[in-house]
Amino acid sequence: MAAPRLPPARALSGVMVPAPIQDLEALRALTALFKEQRNRETAPRTIFQRVLDILKKSSHAVELACRDPSQVENLASSLQLITECFRCLRNACIECSVNQNSIRNLDAIGVAVDLILLFRELRVEQESLLTAFRCGLQFLGNIASRNEDSQSIVWVHAFPELFLSCLNHPDKKIVAYSSMILFTSLNHERMKELEENLNIAIDVIDAYQKHPESEWPFLIITDLFLKSPELVQAMFPKLNNQERVTLLDLMIAKITSDEPLTKDDIPVFLRHAELIASTFVDQCKTVLKLASEEPPDDEEALATIRLLDVLCEMTVNTELLGYLQVFPGLLERVIDLLRVIHVAGKETTNIFSNCGCVRAEGDISNVAEGFKSHLIRLIGNLCYKNKDNQDKVNELDGIPLILDNCNISDSNPFLTQWVIYAIRNLTEDNSQNQDLIAKMEEQGLADASLLKKVGFEVEKKGEKLILKSTRDTPKP
């Protein structure tokens, strides 16, 4: 590669040009050359040493500005050089492990991290400073890309301070680039270190919440966090309601993805199922606050609803269903909660009444009806081909409760759909439950029109009442 030389000074048209200007021109030429793979592969190590020398020298001005804020105004030329040094090194590392190794062995990673931390310390949002900041992060991302040795050094220098400084930065590009570095550097062992620095993990959740279009926070959560049940269990209690909803939404997205959970995913999601089910059993009654006269906490209700949503999606998976069908207290708590909500909606006018409606977020337009629908859906899932649970619902008087919810919710076809599904699963190969519903109709506790609405009819053969289905089972 015919690289430009970097002498201390030179004359242009008889005028001596200061070294910083000359360096800047040469650096820009190098940056352009390193866009080509052949130039990257033939670059001599001495060039990187010279670039690093310029970077170190220029960083002194930033150090001075950190000690004396009045010097910030004098940073322009130094920031230009720093930016171009980072661009040059960034380009040199693209798909070139030889350059990655050469630059790493010059301790450029430590110099870059120290300088980036100085940028954050300045807390000045000048565009020139932000540009240098971004280019520094891009360099760290490129030198670590597909290079385990570089990833290790980046981790040593960057964790935890750089991530704590950058993941919550107001500039979305800085958030994205620091997320890229975190994603690139994390491995199984380093995930354990993250468990001891949960603020970083929470900052990633917040970053995705603020910048859902950014792929790096999304990938960190879905490809790394959700594969570490230990991290999720440690982090979940420390999340606020909005952060919980964000994490649970991504868990739902993972479960319902076009790509089914793999054999390796199942043990991990069984651990997640334990966390979600136990949290729901312990905290689900917080949704009853919505029936109070005080203004409801929509965020708390939405977090509770998302727990239920996750359980509904988990119980569609055969491996997870078996675990949740026998989870202690889950079915009982769901029936109990459905009963309390149903009674609350009948006794007073509140969000659980037919007319109650609260706008929450996204596709949830009616919190109460959606919550009841999913409670009934979960009961149906938990009773799928499980006679013990079918009988338990009967013992807890859950069948009349489910039918009565359908009776008062003519305006909610979504709820009716899940009542049909639940009754179908409750009566499948269960003559006792079939007889109960048939007798309810005979005694006037369930009229024929209601049973017809949910897809059943009672037929009398001699002295025996037979419950018959009139439609196919809807998909869960």
Swiss-Prot record:
<comment type="function">
    <text>May play a role in the regulation of cytokinesis. May play a role in signaling by stimulating protein glycosylation. Induces neuritogenesis by activating the Ras-MAP kinase pathway and is necessary for the survival of cerebellar neurons. Does not appear to play a major role in ciliogenesis.</text>
</comment>
<keyword id="KW-0963">Cytoplasm</keyword>
<dbReference type="InterPro" id="IPR051374">
    <property type="entry name" value="Ataxin-10/CTR86_families"/>
</dbReference>
<comment type="similarity">
    <text>Belongs to the ataxin-10 family.</text>
</comment>
<feature type="modified residue" description="Phosphoserine">
    <location>
        <position position="78"/>
    </location>
</feature>
<dbReference type="InterPro" id="IPR016024">
    <property type="entry name" value="ARM-type_fold"/>
</dbReference>
<comment type="subunit">
    <text>Homooligomer. Interacts with GNB2. Interacts with IQCB1. Interacts with OGT.</text>
</comment>
<dbReference type="GO" id="GO:0051301">
    <property type="term" value="P:cell division"/>
</dbReference>
<keyword id="KW-0488">Methylation</keyword>
<dbReference type="GO" id="GO:0030496">
    <property type="term" value="C:midbody"/>
</dbReference>
<keyword id="KW-0832">Ubl conjugation</keyword>
<dbReference type="Pfam" id="PF09759">
    <property type="entry name" value="Atx10homo_assoc"/>
</dbReference>
<feature type="modified residue" description="Phosphoserine">
    <location>
        <position position="431"/>
    </location>
</feature>
<feature type="modified residue" description="Omega-N-methylarginine">
    <location>
        <position position="10"/>
    </location>
</feature>
<keyword id="KW-0597">Phosphoprotein</keyword>
<dbReference type="InterPro" id="IPR019156">
    <property type="entry name" value="Ataxin-10_domain"/>
</dbReference>
<dbReference type="GO" id="GO:0032465">
    <property type="term" value="P:regulation of cytokinesis"/>
</dbReference>
<dbReference type="GO" id="GO:0005829">
    <property type="term" value="C:cytosol"/>
</dbReference>
<feature type="modified residue" description="Phosphothreonine">
    <location>
        <position position="83"/>
    </location>
</feature>
<keyword id="KW-0206">Cytoskeleton</keyword>
<protein>
    <recommendedName>
        <fullName>Ataxin-10</fullName>
    </recommendedName>
</protein>
<feature type="modified residue" description="Phosphoserine">
    <location>
        <position position="13"/>
    </location>
</feature>
<dbReference type="GO" id="GO:0031175">
    <property type="term" value="P:neuron projection development"/>
</dbReference>
<dbReference type="InterPro" id="IPR011989">
    <property type="entry name" value="ARM-like"/>
</dbReference>
<keyword id="KW-0966">Cell projection</keyword>
<keyword id="KW-0132">Cell division</keyword>
<dbReference type="GO" id="GO:0048471">
    <property type="term" value="C:perinuclear region of cytoplasm"/>
</dbReference>
<dbReference type="GO" id="GO:0005814">
    <property type="term" value="C:centriole"/>
</dbReference>
<keyword id="KW-0131">Cell cycle</keyword>
<dbReference type="GO" id="GO:0036064">
    <property type="term" value="C:ciliary basal body"/>
</dbReference>
<dbReference type="GO" id="GO:0005737">
    <property type="term" value="C:cytoplasm"/>
</dbReference>
